[in-house]
């Protein structure tokens, strides 16, 4: 009995070490699903343009209007088009998974305690329509938590298709997230 009592702390320590060494801590589940959004970190010191924002109007899965400082947009409203992806339509002509993608985006941003918008370069760039800025959307889900990249989450959960994914700063990880969504047959796939 005394030997068992002495072994218990050792066994407990080994069990805890094995649990923390498992994929869950590294952002990988037992079935091999990788949380790429947990792996990608917001670098506030990089040369890309960044600004804090709050949601003004949620439009759909890949378009949101944000309130931003007037130094970013003269009227204080940045009409954002998410970089690297295209979600199915949820307004006008409703497409399969469009409403689900829209709800996913709305839910993540509504519960965020902080939102940072990031350009893919050192200045804000317009999309092909000329009416929206192309952005990476980072949100902090709770106080003290790391920021998560919403664009990447939409891709890894199968709510979006790739759109000019390889032509941006996070192209490689976006491609990996999209491949995984296909492998796991998530939503659109």
Where are these regions (language model features)?
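N-terminal secretory signal peptides that target proteins for export/translocation
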Residues: 1-3
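Small beta-barrel nucleic-acid-binding modules, primarily SNase/OB-fold domains
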Residues: 9, 19-189
């Amino acid at each position: 009995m005394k030997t068992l009592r002495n072994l218990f702390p050792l066994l407990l320590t080994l069990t805890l070490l094995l649990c923390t060494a498992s994929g869950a801590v590294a952002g990988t589940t037992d079935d091999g699903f990788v949380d790429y959004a947990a792996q990608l970190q917001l670098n506030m010191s990089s040369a890309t343009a960044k600004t804090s924002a709050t949601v003004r109007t949620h439009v759909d899965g890949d378009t949101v209007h944000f309130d931003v400082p007037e130094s970013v947009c003269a009227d204080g409203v940045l009409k954002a088009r998410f970089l690297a992806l295209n979600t199915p339509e949820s307004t006008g002509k409703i497409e399969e998974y469009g409403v689900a993608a829209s709800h996913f985006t709305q839910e993540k941003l509504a519960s965020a305690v902080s939102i940072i918008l990031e350009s893919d370069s050192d200045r804000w760039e317009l999309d092909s329509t000329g009416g929206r800025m192309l952005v990476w959307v980072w949100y902090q889900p709770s106080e003290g938590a790391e920021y998560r990249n919403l664009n990447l989450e939409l891709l890894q959960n199968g709510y979006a298709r790739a759109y000019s994914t390889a032509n941006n700063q996070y192209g490689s990880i976006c491609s990996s997230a999209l491949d995984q969504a296909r492998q796991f047959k998530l939503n659109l796939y």
